[in-house]
Amino acid sequence: DTLRSRGLGDVYKRQVDAQRLAYADRDHFFADPDWVDVPVEALLDKTYLQQRASARFAPDAVPKHGDPLGSTALGADTTQEPSGTTHLSLIDSEGNAVSFTATVESAFGSARWVGGFLLNNEMTDFARSYEAEMPMPANVIAGGKRPRSSMSPTMVFDESGELVLVTGSPGGNSIPAYVAKTILGIFDWQLTPQQAADHPNIIARGSKVRVEIGVDGGAEVAANLK
């Protein structure tokens, strides 16, 4: 029984478009909320989300961020985060749960060993790939400012408040796409948690789409995304 046999012919295309739009907004708006006014409520507004969902763009285009507040004064940021992260999800016999993501940023972090552990190099999570012009990106480096992170430890609850899923992932910039795929796999594709986590990924940010080996009908999927 494959995903293709489930009648999901255009699921991957929709998944790719949704990721590209979400990353465009994330890259533009998200940074340390103590330094930047992140418009979380506006970005989650149903009318705004419907507007973004109806957006159309060429496969090789870089989708522009939305503008839920009517005006923005932030620069573009396309910084790629290294992938030196670990995640675990646990639920014990008494129902206690934890979704835990830890990272030292790059593999072995800063390569500095102190007191039995490695120091991280999280400063590489600040905006580094941007044009030297004003306005500056939301995630630009500053003293005392926390860098943006893609870590996404996640718990899903039903309408009654009961815990139904604990998930998360390593993977640098790709973490949001990995977590979304797992949630989609469990609740929309009716996969088991293990099947959903194991399912090959499609990651889309900007104009680039990465289709992992093992995606059902991968060649067809890649052709459909051109």
Model-predicted regions and their roles:
Residues 1-8:
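Positively charged, low-complexity/disordered segments
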Residues 6, 19-30, 52, 56, ...:
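Structural signal for hydrophobic packing residues in well-ordered secondary-structure cores
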Residues 9-10, 38, 42-43, 77, ...:
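Hydrophobic alpha-helical scaffolding
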Residues 16-19, 176, 180-183, 194-197, ...:
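Extracytoplasmic/secreted envelope proteins and their assembly/folding machinery
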Residues 22, 95, 155, 179, ...:
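Hydrophobic, well-ordered secondary-structure elements that form the walls
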Residues 96-165, 176, 189, 193:
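Active-site rim segments in enzyme catalytic domains, especially the processed small/beta chain
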